[in-house]
């Protein structure tokens, strides 16, 4: 079975002045804040007619304060996220492992439970991080394994 990417779910960017960047994307593109933290702001870039869009994860532009040193394992900075179905998730995770890719899995919990999702991250040959994310309304209640 071939992977079927449904949508781009998220784009993460580092910015030099977070308040200025947020204001720009709000004023120029009309994006709305979904969640805001001191060094990270999630802006809704569109609605999706998909499990993630209807299940609590709209298309997002995520802005990160460039001055703050981030723990990449705990953030979603500098990556592209592609939505896949929950039915494909485990099969794709196994296929990527068989291809020899180093994977990191994240079940979105705690302050990110609102995402209602699980993700697998891996790098392309140039070191760009790719995320496959699937809507999973039960993810927040599951024990993190990796």
Q: What does each model-identified segment do?
A:
Residues 30-36, 102-106:
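Short secondary-structure junctions
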Residues 10-12, 42, 79-81, 119-121:
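Short aromatic/hydrophobic contact patches that present stacked aromatics
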Residues 32-74, 86, 129-134:
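Conserved short beta-strand elements that form part of the metal-binding/catalytic scaffold
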Residues 18, 81-126:
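Vicinal oxygen chelate
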Residues 113-115, 133-139:
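Short beta->alpha transition motifs characteristic of CBS
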């Amino acid at each position: 079975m071939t992977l079927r990417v449904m949508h781009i779910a998220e784009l993460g960017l580092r910015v030099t002045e977070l308040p200025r960047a947020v204001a720009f994307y709000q004023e120029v593109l009309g994006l709305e804040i979904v969640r805001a933290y001191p060094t990270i702001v999630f802006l809704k870039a569109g609605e999706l007619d998909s499990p993630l869009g209807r299940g609590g994860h709209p298309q997002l532009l995520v802005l990160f304060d460039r001055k703050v040193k981030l723990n990449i394992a705990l953030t979603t900075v500098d990556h592209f996220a592609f939505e896949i179905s929950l039915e494909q998730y485990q099969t794709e995770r196994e296929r990527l492992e068989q291809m020899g890719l180093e994977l990191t899995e994240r079940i979105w919990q705690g302050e990110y439970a609102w995402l209602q999702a699980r993700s697998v991250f891996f790098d392309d040959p140039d070191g760009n991080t790719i995320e496959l994310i699937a809507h999973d309304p039960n993810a927040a209640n599951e024990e993190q394994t990796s």
